[in-house]
From Swiss-Prot:
Disordered as annotated region, ranges: 1-29
InterPro entries in the cross-refs: NA-bd_OB-fold, RNA-binding_domain_S1_IF1, TIF_eIF-1A, TIF_eIF-1A_CS
CDD domains according to UniProt: S1_IF1A
Composition bias, Low complexity: 7-18
Function: Seems to be required for maximal rate of protein biosynthesis. Enhances ribosome dissociation into subunits and stabilizes the binding of the initiator Met-tRNA(I) to 40 S ribosomal subunits.
BP terms from Gene Ontology: translational initiation
The name this protein goes by in its record: Translation initiation factor 1A 3
One Gene Ontology CC term in the entry: cytoplasm
Assigned protein family: Belongs to the eIF-1A family.
A single MF term (Gene Ontology): translation initiation factor activity
Keyword entries, A-Z: Initiation factor, Protein biosynthesis
Top-level lineage group: Archaea
Domain S1-like per the UniProt entry, residue ranges: 22-96
UniProt organism field: Methanosarcina acetivorans (strain ATCC 35395 / DSM 2834 / JCM 12185 / C2A)
Amino acid sequence: MIRKRQSGSNKSVSSGNNQEVTRVRTPRKDRNEVLATVASLLGSKRVTLQCMDGVVRMGRIPGSKNKKMWVREGDVVIANPWEIQDSKADVIWKYTKPQVDWLERKGYLN
C-alpha cells in the first residue's frame, strides 16, 4: 500500500507488507552451499545451524554481512561449510518470509 505523507511532500511511503518474489537465490552445489535453519544464537556473530544435509554446524556471520543481515532463531539461511572443518560454516545469505514460502512450494525445504 502506498500513501502520501500529510506534511505536503510528494514522497510516498510504502508499508512493505506486500513483497513479491521475483528471484530467489538457491544454494549452488559447485560452491558447496547448503540450506540451513538457525537453531540458536550463540553471541559474538556465531549461531548454531541445522543444515539440510543433516549436520549441525556452528555458523559464523562474516564481518561484511554483520550489520546488514540481522539473524534470528528460525531464519532460513545459506551456509557455506568450511573445507578444513566440516562442523563449521559461514552464513552467506538470509531469506525473507516470501522467499521461504517459495522454497517450500518448490521443494527445497523439507
